[in-house]
């Protein structure tokens, strides 16, 4: 995986780190930097970017470029060549819980109703999940909710791992990855793997 080293893959709970600026640029008129490494998660797959500070500047957006670099958009120019990053811990943990919850609920709809997840949007106050069903009764919705809650109450360990592109065919995915390259997999039990292109 090229570009910025993604520290959140090594430790999803890491919220403080030091990094070198490798590029200074602008994004929509705001100062931005690319770092050699980051704990800031970029906007991806319906999950918002991490909030926080870099060298005292507020992080306004975190975006992944096509070259794999992570762009950190700031409220003011970064000073110096080395920065201390601080990710907003409560917001990060909220995003992690909501994202995992979405995977669990999506799987419940798939198992019970063969309802494919079409889109997911995570907001500050509400998250939405669009399921591809022509019709669903209230009873269907309650069954999916009960199934998802049962999985949550089982307190399953969530594991992440990477699968090289040439071995993706060995992974039981519901649909093919949208991107080429390394696939990040998330599993809450041996027979269910949720793929996430990274």
Regions found by a protein language model. Name each.
Residues 1-198:
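A glycine- and charged-residue-rich anion-binding loop/surface
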């Amino acid at each position: 995986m090229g570009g910025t080293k993604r520290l959140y893959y090594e430790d999803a709970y890491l919220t403080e780190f030091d990094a070198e600026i490798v590029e200074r640029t602008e994004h929509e008129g705001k100062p931005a930097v690319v770092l050699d490494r980051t704990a800031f998660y970029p906007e991806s797959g319906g999950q918002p970017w991490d909030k926080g500070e870099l060298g005292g500047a507020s992080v306004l957006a975190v975006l992944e470029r096509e070259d794999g670099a992570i762009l950190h958009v700031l409220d003011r120019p970064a000073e110096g060549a080395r920065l201390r990053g601080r990710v907003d811990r409560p917001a990060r943990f909220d995003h992690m819980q909501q994202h995992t919850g979405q995977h669990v609920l999506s799987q419940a709809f798939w198992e019970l109703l063969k309802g494919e997840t079409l889109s997911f949007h995570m907001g500050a106050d509400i998250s939405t999940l669009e399921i591809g069903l022509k019709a669903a009764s209230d009873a269907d919705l309650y069954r999916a909710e009960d199934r998802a809650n049962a999985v949550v109450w089982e307190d399953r360990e969530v594991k992440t791992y990477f699968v090289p592109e040439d071995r993706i065919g060995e992974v039981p995915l519901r649909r093919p990855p949208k991107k080429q390259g390394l696939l990040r997999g998330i599993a809450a039990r041996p027979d269910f793997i949720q793929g996430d292109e990274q």
